[in-house]
Regions:
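Conserved acidic carboxylate
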Residues: 29-31
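Basic, Lys/Arg-enriched C-terminal extension of HTH/homeodomain DNA-binding domains
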Residues: 2, 9, 213-238
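Short amphipathic alpha-helix used as the core "switch/output" element in two-component signaling
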Residues: 82-96
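Helix-turn-helix DNA-binding segment
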Residues: 162-204
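Recognition helix of helix-turn-helix DNA-binding domains
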Residues: 188-223, 227
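Short, flexible helix-to-coil linker/hinge segments that flank and couple to helix-turn-helix
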Residues: 110-114, 120, 124-172, 176
């Protein structure tokens, strides 16, 4: 039966007319089968369930303002809409209780959603009965994440950030020119190319490279670039 639902995502499937006290549920999910199955199952439980329009972030937020969902089921990998983590805060600010339903196994990414206001998260790999039960708990405003678990996740997130800040500290000592040279080296540019682009001598560029190596406490250009990738410096300075 579910195979018949694998076509284009329906924008709205309402099984019954909503009764008083129904809680609107918005499903922010681009997987058609899962989204449509959730709509049918939740509608059968008396919820007004609707699939979000994912044509743009602006359209999605306008739909939230109009539909006023009490609960939003949020995937984190939204294709052209980008990272769903960034959607948690604006959705909660619009009054929704956000439950993350995602295939990600990145513990810190999930912890960040909790920090931003999500009431909990559940893997897409969980049995559908568990997923439905968890959603209904959120609808009923029952906790789905214990205080201890929440504290543990946020503590892990703080620890990871402290480590990253420590690892990035040497890079903060680089001058703007040294940062540019390091970025150029990561792109595979040669000393003469870097010098020509900056209209400086090759000796100047080599001096700047020596400065980079000394500040990062590495012995070669390759090590400097590898370290920058490892600690996420390029991601922080695109």
């Amino acid at each position: 039966m579910l195979n018949n639902l694998s076509g284009p995502v329906a924008q709205d499937i309402l099984v019954d007319e909503p009764n008083e006290g129904d809680i609107p549920v918005l499903i922010v999910e681009d997987h058609a089968l899962l989204a449509n199955t959730l709509v049918i199952a939740l509608s059968a439980e008396g919820c007004r369930a609707r699939i979000a329009d994912l044509s743009s972030v602006e359209v999605l937020l306008q739909q939230v303002r109009t539909f006023r969902p009490g609960v939003v089921l949020l995937d984190l990998d939204l294709g052209r809409l980008g990272d769903g983590v960034a959607m948690v805060k604006p959705l909660t600010e619009l009054g929704a209780r956000v439950l993350v339903v995602s295939g990600t196994t990145d513990r810190l990414r999930l912890a960040e959603t909790v920090e931003l206001g999500a009431v909990g998260f559940l893997s897409k790999q969980a049995p559908f009965e568990q997923l439905l039960s968890t959603v209904l708990d959120v609808v009923a405003q029952r906790p789905v994440l214990s205080t201890a678990r929440r504290y543990e996740l946020l503590a892990d997130l703080r620890a990871a950030r402290a480590i990253r800040e420590r690892d990035l500290a040497p890079f903060t000592t680089l001058t703007p020119r040294e940062r540019s040279v390091l970025a150029a080296l990561a792109q595979g540019q040669r000393v003469d190319t870097i010098a020509a682009a900056a209209v400086v001598s090759e000796a100047t560029v080599r001096s700047q490279i020596r400065g980079v190596l000394a500040k990062l406490n590495v012995n070669s250009q390759l090590e400097a670039v590898a370290l920058a990738w490892t600690v996420g410096w390029f991601q922080a300075h695109p």
